[in-house]
Amino acid sequence: AVLVGAKGAGKTCTFLQVCQSRNWATYLQRVGELAHDAGVAQQRIIFPVLWSDNVEGAAKATVGETKNIGLRQLDLGTETLSLSEIQRQIETNLESENYHWDDFWTNLIATTLGCPGCSLQEINQQLSSKGHSVVLMFDGVEDVFKKPSESKQTRAIESLLKLVNRLGELSNQNIGALIFVRIDYVQAAIKQNLGQFMSRFSAFALIWNPESFLRLAYWLCAKAEIVGATIEGAQTLSVEELIEKLTELWGHKLGQADSKEGHSARWVYAALCDLTGRFQARDLVRFFRFAAEEEIKNQNAFWADRILSPESMRKAIPRCSHEKVQEATLEIQPLRSWSERMDAENIIERSIPFSASSVSLQSDELTALRELGVVYEDLDPSLGEKRLFLPEIYRAGLRFDLSG
């Protein structure tokens, strides 16, 4: 599977959790899932092939140990490649492209597993004869491919992403793969049917839903030692209990309990989401930081029943948006191109709803940003050309107002 997530979505953290498990059955047990066939899952050995340069210390040792144990258990050979050797091989093929990237990844996998020169079919057959299967793990793609829009790097990334297709063609498949990759790399590599590709792997996307949002909010409270929150409670409390506990943080509503204001938890989640309902953990972390800073500057005894007042929460959102856009323009190429073009063309009038032509938004950018939840197009004909909208988490950062 391809696990797509933005920077900070938890790709490397998840990669490390899987590596620590050593086999698929143990990982499923850790995350509270039951294996359809525990015996088969136990034989699915975790084997890291590529990982991030940022993995250091104990985490790096864990990855290395998982790889060495996997090499012994799979029993395909005793020699493997180090991370630096793998990185050098990738760099060499980027310069020369002596090997088609499909062949390159096959050779790299075979050599890393200790059986250089073997095809995927041959590796699969050897695993079958030994009663084993393997889950190949790839992370840190952005460390070895720093310019995904360059043609050579695009071809390399596309081939890696499509490795799962080639593995799926094996009869009696004993080789699987988990490829952790940033969304902008998928955009750069998959030129056709991007939406179809994303849909295919949507079940594996590293995203946060409303329940995990509440659990993270409560966990952050536990780390900050406020509202009596506990680390254990972040996992064990029901959604209703979490909502009730968090009222000490931000109240029931963005006003008094009998007001017509929105419910606080729902309001924060909606303010931090994109237009597909996706939320990123780092957005909530910075929301807490900015809201706390605003609260310190403007303490109001009227809201003594909560830690964060409605005013502080409202003021935090534009600050979150500005940081969000700064990060997202580095990760999402169509957003970067559009933002830079608006600045270069000195487009000052930016209001919602808007038309693509009024803000120099090109059709291919619109398509990509719509799929990513950055732009929403309302098809109501009564709106005319001005039918495009931005979520709040992007609006202020892109300097749009609501006066349209």
Language-model segment annotations:
Residues 52, 181-185, 381-385:
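Short beta-alpha junction loops
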Residues 14-16, 135, 178-183, 214-217, ...:
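Short, hydrophobic, well-ordered secondary-structure elements
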Residues 1, 116-119, 158-162, 198, ...:
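Short linear interaction motifs
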Residues 254-404:
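C-terminal leucine-rich, beta-strand-based interaction scaffolds used for sensing/assembly
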Residues 125-126, 141-261:
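The catalytic "switch" region of P-loop NTPases
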Residues 2-135, 144-150, 154:
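P-loop NTPase nucleotide-binding core
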Residues 23, 110, 114, 158-165, ...:
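Alpha-helical repeat scaffolds in large eukaryotic proteins
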